[in-house]
Each structure stands twice: as structure tokens, then as C-alpha cells.
Curated annotation (Swiss-Prot):
Main location: nucleus
Subcellular location, record wording: Nucleus
GO molecular function, one term: DNA-binding transcription factor activity, RNA polymerase II-specific
Gene from which this protein is expressed: xlnR
Similarity-based family: Belongs to the xlnR/xlr1 family.
Biased composition, class Polar residues, residue ranges: 177-188, 218-251
Protein name listed in UniProt: Xylanolytic transcriptional activator xlnR
Amino acid composition bias (Low complexity), ranges on this chain: 14-24
Taxonomic classification: Eukaryota, Fungi, Dikarya, Ascomycota, Pezizomycotina
GO biological process annotation, one example: positive regulation of DNA-templated transcription
Cellular component aspect of the GO annotation: nucleus
Length: 945
């Protein structure tokens, strides 16, 4: 079926009738311009100018007469002209047709007696919108230029309602059907859509109904066009109501791609028009010639006609001859008038800025591509890239130290994520969680103004992360939409309860098919929730992370790769290729003999190790925080390699870390959490086991009085002494040797990572600055390690529960263990003073440090409460240091238990200094009531209220 050619219409509002222009403007053509008016208000401007000129006939009678003659002449001209049919394919006007219109516009504006009416701009920039300031709509606007602000049009355009999925599927199916040899029917359908838009009652600029235009348009329309329109309308109606059997997978595929983010293009006085960005669809979904194959002369394209430096996020009319898919896929066709309407291309000032969320072809970090369709309505693309920078930003120029308090340790390599051409393949849930973590502390203007912006964005990112993660349902059945699809599934008499077991997984080795990325996503969620006031709720996410890590067998080394491509010894020579090779997502769970043929990169192996050791450390840390037993056992990771040095890890020098120990470490080896904090958590695990064995309701008393108890305590004490010696060796290696200049032959770790960590690191231009930064970082590590080591001594010898400690029913204060524990409490306070000297805001490890500061303070509170004015000066100084440390913690990572204990400690310190209140007994009782909220005895849950 051939599509009737659409003629090239004359210039509709030309006030002059030239010889070269043999036809005028038919009244029926006015309604036909509604399609153009959907994209811009250029035609409305021309109509307004013409009527203004007609109203000022006294000022310029010739112009008014010429305009009336032109309008009356247009009524007598036929709608189609053979000469114009021959040139209908041309999208450009010749000079004879263009110049009279330009001259007419100049004459009308020159002779208009009234002042120009200020037109309302279509959209204000983001800064003016937030500040509620008048904006001129330019890019950049005058307000932003005056105050030096960043002028952007990146926020989402609000809309009413959303496009129907049925309409999207029907339109895509119709386009695909047209590309398979039925282009004529597709043309008729699209023609019917435009005709249905044109068939609305004609309105002038003031909104009045013009019945003559409407009746003339209907009566003057050729019969063959009416027939085509009717056929197109009926065909479109059928495609919307009847299910599509020829393309069964297209609609479901589009639904699966979450095309829920639509940007609205609003024209004044016209209904909203939604347009979705389909660039995220895979090639298999799109038809061979694109979505517009049935209508190559589509007039809707996403371009910016104003300046070349601005993003391609504007809406204008243009031909798509170069790329038929351009109007739908957001590409930029050449700016010109469409061939079916020979109007001159209006100036950029006539285009209102219909801002869409751009999907720039020059994405700074291509790793974000999977999550871009989901975050388009939440944050701009540039902000997403900035948040990735925040996530990987290091606060130290010498050694890696995450600046975000919610990034407790680096699991992934920065270069793998931020690589410009070959980034790591990541799940959308992991990327969304990383953006959510970074948005908690980012100082981007988009998140700080207005003050409620951060909370709104973080809430949307959290909902997106959970939606993409589908908690506890890692393997949904095909076509199932609900995450709880198996909640009522019963197979062989067993209720599966919605924990990820589907019909096709019953014969698999495991019930979950989650990948390493899912575990990391759980870690991000759990970390932020743990740092909030809802600490008990964080255990849901931690438990899911620990369980999935155990199912993935992250505590075991993967079998070696099949070495058929390279001989022994050749792996180290191709380290660059290994670093650039994007690792695949590990979704295989049973790494047994049957899966030994899987080739896994060394980077992916190290990711698995670091993820396990991070979970291992947090398991022991939270066991102390929440008074709970251990989940991950030492025997599960006895053969797992210890994590490699963070600096070597980020550089990707896997060959330098080929020789490592296996099993949980007990010595300080580096500046990162894995180097100095993980060994302490290994020792803490033994202390936690002893604590719960001592308080066991049945075997606790017998174990406490047995020789086995003393032997276990001595073993843990030896581990603490070993850690203390390694800490001194570590300090000597990275302070004394560097100061004397004898560490030049050490592995180039101190400065090797400076080319990829942070701008501050890259700006260090001298060796002296790097050495001083390394020494400062080392002293902070030693101070934190010393403090936590003293606290572990206290936990091993003393009582964890503050109320039992203050009541002292068993007279533990008179024992030798109390004297030993008290000396460690003073030592911990001295280490805290050194920490405050090097890290005044306690931002080095705020997520972990709070509980150790609290447990190390209970003995000082006991001394202040019991001794009061008789306390020694060292105890008084220690109490003052603890109060200052808690005040710094409250500023950095504000939590309720730190605020509460600060008040309790200040009250006790006032009594030590002699300021005893009249209600002394009530003050002591109130302190005990406050401390009773946090119990570590019996069924107490510690900090988890």
C-alpha cells in the first residue's frame, strides 16, 4: 500500500503575495499547524504578529491592506498544487519565499505602536526555581551570571499522570509491523494520530472557538485523505484494544525495562504530551529500522537549537532523513524545517526550553549505564557521576582512607568502576546503593538546596535500591512481577515462604542465585541503617548479607583457572590485560568439582575475599554492639587468603601480593581497615565467645571456674600482645624509617596510588609532603589501634554491662582484674587524647569507633561515681578526654547513645570536681536509669534499642 505524498504547504501567515508564490493560505491549513505548535510557539507568534499588524491599520494602511489581500487571496487557492507536490520532499525554503516573510515580520514589529508584550518563559533554571527568583529562561540566565551560580536545566519536568503501557506497547508494535513491509498502514495510523490532534476545535490565541475554520477544514479535506484518516483511526483503535499476536515479546520486554520515567512537554493552552526515552532498550526490542521506520519524515526530535555547548535536551522540529530513529532515540538530526511544511526555520529565541533528562552520549562513567534509566527522574546524570567520585574519594593524600563515614572499607577497585571504556559489569542494585551511600554526605548543591532535597533524593534512591535488589528473592520465576511470588507456593508439602525458591530451581545446588554484587548491596544498606537510630532494623540486612555470603561460599578460595591459554609464569607478564578485563558477575554458587572449569579473574577473586573479610569484621563488631553471638566462624575461612594491601589493590598489582597468609589475621599489616582493624576483630571474636560461654545459663558457672577458662584467657592475651608488638613495628616502619630516609627501598606503596585516589593526592608535588602525610596517617592508625587494643583488654578482664558494673554485687572492684582493667581504661583515654590531636573530628573511622569509646569509658564512670572528690588527677583528665571525644563523635556521626552517655559522664565529672547537687541521690538514680537502656547482660541487646 503506497502512502499518499503530503504536499508542501505555503508560508501560512505571509502578509505579502509575491509572484513566485502563486498560492495563498487556505483556512483549513490553520488547524493543520497544531502539530507544529505542539513543538514550539512559532506559529502562534506569527499569528499574533499578523493580527497585531491588522489591528494597527491606521499606523500602516499599506501593510494592513496587504495582509487582508493575502488572507482573502488564500481562500481562493486550492489546497494542493502540482508544482509544490514536486518539491514536497525538500525541507528548505528558497530565497524568494523566505525573504518576504522576514521583511513582513520586521515591518510589523517596526510599525507596531504598542510595546512588545513580555512573553512568559516556559521554564526557569534550577537555581532560580530553588531560590524562587525571576528567570529569563536563557542558558545561562542573567541571575546566575550576576551571582556566579551554575545555571542548569536538569531537574525533572513535572507531569500529570503517566503514559499508558498499553499505548506504548501498541505504538511500538505498530512501528515494528510497519518496518516489516506494512509501512503504508503505519503511515496511515500515524497520520490518523496527527489528524485526530488537528480535529480539535480551532482556537485563536485568546482561546476563542472559530467555527468557520473548523467547518472549512472538514469540508475542504480531500476524500482520499479522509479515507486514509478513517482507516488510520480504525487501525490505531484496533491496535490499542486488540492484543498483539504478531509481536508477543515486545510489550513484555518494554514493560520489563521499567519505562516508567516520562518527561512531559507542556505547551501553553495544550494538553500535556509525554515522551519516553527508549535508548535504554536493547537492540532486540527495537525494530530493524528503528521505531519510526513507518514514518521517516517525523517532525519530533530532541535537539537544542540554541548553542552547541548545551546538552541535547531540547525539543524542536526537524527532519530525520539521516537517522530515522533519531526522533525517538534522542539523537540530533540537522536543524531545518520539515519537508511537509515550508516554514522558515525560526530563530532560537522562538523556542521554549522543553527540558528533558538527557542521556548524554558522552557519559563520564559508562559503568552507570545500567542504572541510568532508573535514576533519570531522581538525580541528573552529572550528579550521579559526582556521587561515584564521592564514594571512592580518599580523605588522605598518602594512603587510602574513605572520606564517607558509610564506606567502611573498599571492596572494589576505583579504576575498574571509573574506567572510561571498559568498566566493571555491575548490577543496577549495586550502583543505586553506591549512589545512595554517597548522597548521604555529598555537598552537591542539588542535595543541599532546599534543605529537604537530600532527604527526598535519598529516600527515592533507597526505594530504588530495594526494588532493584528484590530482597531475599534473588531468583524470581519468569514473568513474575511480585517479589513475594512464592509466598504461598507449596511443593511436596513444604511451604517455600517466598525465600527465592522457584520451580526451575528445585534441582539446583542452592535456592538463591544472588551474585557478589547483591552481597555488597546488602552491606551498603546495612551500614547506613546501623549508623542511624534504627540499629535493630539493620540486623535484617546484615543477616541477609551474611547468609548470602555463606551460600556463595565467599569464605573459600575458588579453584584455579584452567591454564590452557597461558603457561606457568606468564600470568604476571600480562597484568595490564588482567586489570583492564572486566570481570563477570559470579552467579554460580556451587564451586565444587563440577564448576572448576570457570575462569575467574584475579580481581574478582580479590573482591570475594575482601567482601568476606569485611563481613567477618562487622560480624564481630556488631556482636559487641548488640550483645549477640557470632555468625561467621573462623573455621569457615581458615583457608582463605588475607586481603592484599589497599594501595596495591587499587593499583592492580596482583603479582606483588602473590605471597600472603591464610586465615584470620592477628597482626597489624597496613593503613586500611583490613590492615589494622581486621586483626582486632579476629581477637574480639574470641572474647565474644568467652563472654557468651561465661554467661551461659547452664554451663557458664562451671566453665568460669575451670582451668580451661584461664587457658583461653591467656591465649587471647597473647594475641593482644602480638598485635601490640606488630603495631609498634608498623609505627617504626612508617614513621622512623621514613623520617631518616631509609625506607626508599620499600615497595612503592606510599605514592603508587596517588594517580587514582583523589585530586588532593594528585596535587602532592614533593616527596616531603607525601612523607609527612604518610607519617600523620600512620600515627592515626597507631592511636586508633592502641585505643581499641586497650578496650579489648578491658572486655576480656572486666564487665560489659554498665549497670552491673555500678552495682558491683560480687565486689569485683576489690579484685586484681579490676586494677588491671582500670590501668587499661586510663591507657585507652590517653590514646583517645592522641586521637583527638591527630583527628579532631574523629572522622577516620566513625562507624566503628563509637562502641569502643563507650566500653572504654564505663570504668572511668565507675571511678567518678564511687570516688567522687577522691579521684586521682589521671582519672579526672581521662574523664574530661572521654567527654570531649563523645562531643566530637556527636558532631561527626550523631547517634542517641553517644549523646546520652555524654550527659551521664558530664554529670559524674561535675561531682568529681566538687559540684555536688542537692538531689545527689536522684542524680545517681537517673544515671542508672539512663544506662539501663543499654544492657549487655542476660537478654540485653546492647545498643539495639
Amino acid at each position: 500500500m503506497s502512502t499518499p505524498s503530503i504536499p508542501q504547504f505555503p508560508s501560512p501567515f505571509s502578509p505579502f503575495s509575491s509572484g513566485s508564490q502563486s498560492t495563498g493560505m487556505a483556512p483549513s491549513q490553520t488547524v493543520g499547524l497544531d502539530t507544529l505548535a505542539e513543538g514550539s510557539q512559532y506559529v502562534l507568534e506569527q499569528l499574533q504578529l499578523s493580527r497585531d499588524a491588522a489591528g494597527t491599520g491606521a499606523g500602516d494602511g499599506a501593510t494592513s491592506t496587504s495582509l487582508r489581500n493575502s488572507m482573502s487571496h488564500a481562500k481562493d487557492q486550492p489546497l494542493f498544487d502540482d508544482e509544490r507536490n514536486q518539491s514536497a520532499g525538500s525541507g528548505f525554503k528558497n530565497t524568494l519565499q523566505r525573504d518576504p516573510l522576514v521583511e513582513a515580520r520586521s515591518a510589523i514589529r517596526k510599525n507596531s505602536s504598542s510595546a512588545p508584550v513580555r512573553r512568559r518563559i516556559s521554564r526557569a533554571c534550577d537555581q532560580c526555581n530553588q531560590l524562587r527568583t525571576k528567570c529569563d529562561g536563557q542558558h545561562p540566565c542573567a541571575h546566575c551570571i550576576e551571582f556566579g551560580l551554575t545555571c542548569e536545566y536538569a531537574r525533572e519536568r513535572k507531569k500529570r499522570g503517566k503514559a499508558s503501557k498499553k499505548d506504548l506497547a501498541a505504538a511500538a508494535a505498530a512501528a515494528t509491523h510497519g518496518s516489516n513491509g506494512h509501512s503504508g498502514q503505519a503511515n496511515a495510523s500515524l497520520m490518523a494520530e496527527r489528524t485526530s490532534e488537528d480535529s480539535r476545535p480551532a482556537q485563536d490565541v485568546n482561546g476563542r472557538y472559530d467555527s468557520t475554520f473548523e467547518s472549512h477544514h472538514i469540508s475542504s479535506q480531500p476524500s482520499h485523505m479522509q479515507h486514509a484518516n478513517n482507516a488510520g483511526i480504525s487501525g490505531l483503535h484496533d491496535s490499542q484494544t486488540a492484543p498483539s499476536h504478531s509481536q508477543p515479546s515486545l510489550g513484555t520486554t518494554i514493560d520489563a525495562m521499567h519505562l516508567g520515567h516520562f518527561n512531559t512537554l507542556n505547551d501553553s493552552g495544550r494538553p500535556a504530551m509525554s515522551m519516553s526515552d527508549l535508548r535504554s532498550l536493547p537492540p532486540s526490542v527495537l525494530p530493524p529500522q528503528g521505531l519510526s521506520s513507518g514514518y521517516n519524515a517525523s517532525a519530533f526530535a530532541l535537539v537544542n537549537p540554541q548553542e552547541p555547548g548545551s546538552p541535547a535536551n531540547q525539543f524542536r522540529l526537524g527532519s530525520s532523513a539521516e537517522n530515522p530513529t533519531a526522533p525517538f532515540l534522542g539523537l540530533s538530526p540537522p536543524g531545518q524545517s520539515p519537508g511537509w511544511l515550508p516554514l522558515p526555520s525560526p530563530s532560537p529565541a522562538n523556542f521554549p526550553s522543553f527540558s528533558l533528562h538527557p542521556f548524554s552520549s558522552t557519559l563520564r562513567y559508562p559503568v552507570l549505564q545500567p542504572v541510568l534509566p532508573h535514576i533519570a527522574s531522581i538525580i541528573p546524570q552529572s550528579l550521579a557521576c559526582d556521587l561515584l567520585d564521592v564514594y571512592f574519594h580518599s580523605s588522605s593524600p598518602s594512603h587510602l582512607s574513605p572520606s564517607s563515614p558509610y564506606v567502611v572499607g573498599y571492596i572494589f577497585r576505583k579504576q575498574s568502576f571509573l574506567h572510561p571504556t571498559k568498566p566493571r559489569l555491575c548490577s543496577s542494585g549495586l550502583l543505586a546503593s553506591m549512589l545512595w551511600v554517597a548522597a548521604q554526605t555529598s555537598e552537591a548543591p542539588f542535595l543541599t538546596s532546599p534543605p529537604s532535597a537530600r532527604g527526598r533524593v535519598c529516600q527515592k534512591l533507597l526505594e530504588l535500591t530495594i526494588g532493584l535488589l528484590r530482597p531475599l528473592v534473588h531468583g524470581p520465576a519468569t514473568g513474575e512481577a511480585s517479589p513475594n511470588y512464592a509466598a504461598n507456593m507449596v511443593i511436596n508439602g513444604v511451604a517455600l515462604g517466598g525465600f527465592g525458591v522457584s520451580m526451575d530451581q528445585l534441582g539446583a545446588q542452592s535456592s538463591a542465585t544472588g551474585a557478589v554484587d547483591d552481597v555488597a548491596t546488602y552491606v551498603h544498606l546495612a551500614t547506613v541503617v546501623s549508623a542511624s537510630e534504627y540499629k535493630a532494623a539493620s540486623m535484617r540486612w546484615w543477616t541477609a548479607a551474611w547468609s548470602l555470603a555463606r551460600e556463595l561460599k565467599l569464605g573459600r578460595e575458588l579453584p584455579p583457572n584452567v591454564s590452557h591459554a597461558r603457561q606457568d609464569g606468564e600470568r604476571d607478564g600480562d597484568g595490564e590485560a588482567d586489570r583492564r578485563h572486566p570481570p563477570t558477575l559470579i552467579t554460580s554458587l556451587g564451586h565444587g568439582p563440577g564448576s572448576s572449569g570457570i575462569n575467574v579473574t584475579e580481581e574478582e577473586r580479590e573482591e570475594r575475599r575482601r567482601l568476606w573479610w569485611l563481613l567477618y569484621a562487622t560480624d564481630r563488631h556488631l556482636a559487641l554492639c548488640y550483645n549477640r553471638p557470632l555468625t561467621l566462624l573462623d573455621k569457615e575461612c581458615g583457608g582463605l587468603l588475607q586481603p592484599m594491601n589497599d594501595d596495591l589493590w587499587q593499583v592492580g598489582d596482583f603479582a606483588a601480593a602473590a605471597y600472603r597468609q591464610v586465615g584470620p589475621p592477628v597482626e597489624c599489616t597496613g593503613h586500611s581497615m583490613y590492615g589494622y582493624f581486621l586483626p582486632l576483630m579476629t581477637i574480639l571474636g574470641g572474647i565474644v565467645d568467652l563472654h557468651h560461654a561465661e554467661n551461659h545459663p547452664r554451663f557458664g558457672l562451671a566453665f568460669r571456674n575451670s582451668p580451661e577458662w584461664e587457658r583461653q584467657v591467656q591465649d587471647v592475651t597473647r594475641q593482644l600482645d602480638t598485635y601490640g608488638r606488630s603495631l609498634k613495628e608498623f609505627e617504626a616502619r612508617y614513621t622512623s624509617n621514613l623520617t631518616l630516609g631509609t625506607a626508599e627501598n620499600e615497595p612503592a606503596v606510599e605514592g603508587a596510588h596517588l594517580d587514582h585516589t583523589s585530586p588532593s593526592g594528585r596535587s602532592s608535588s614533593t616527596v616531603g609532603s607525601r612523607v609527612s602525610g604518610s607519617i600523620m596517617h600512620t600515627r592515626m592508625v597507631v592511636a586508633y589501634g592502641t585505643h581499641i587494643m586497650h578496650v579489648l583488654h578491658i572486655l576480656l578482664a572486666g564487665k560489659w554491662d554498665p549497670v552491673n558494673l555500678l552495682e558491683d554485687h560480687d565486689l569485683w572492684i576489690s579484685s586484681e582484674s579490676f586494677v588491671s582493667a582500670m590501668s587499661h581504661a586510663v591507657g585507652a583515654a590517653e590514646a583517645a587524647a592522641e586521637i583527638l590531636e591527630h583527628d579532631p573530628d574523629l572522622s577516620f573511622m566513625p562507624f566503628f569507633f563509637g562502641i569502643y569509646l563507650l566500653q572504654g569509658s564505663f570504668l572511668l564512670l565507675l571511678a567518678a561515681d564511687k570516688l567522687q572528690g577522691d579521684a586521682s588527677p589521671s582519672v579526672v583528665r581521662a574523664c574530661e578526654t572521654i567527654v570531649r571525644a563523645h562531643e566530637a563523635c556527636v558532631v561527626t556521626l550523631n547517634t542517641e547513645y553517644q549523646r546520652t552517655f555524654r550527659k551521664v559522664m558530664r554529670s559524674a565529672l561535675a561531682q568529681v570536681r566538687g559540684r555536688i547537687p542537692e538531689d545527689f541521690g536522684e542524680q545517681q538514680q537517673r544515671r542508672r536509669e539512663v544506662l539501663a537502656l543499654y544492657r549487655w547482660s542476660g537478654d540485653g541487646s546492647g545498643l539495639a534499642l
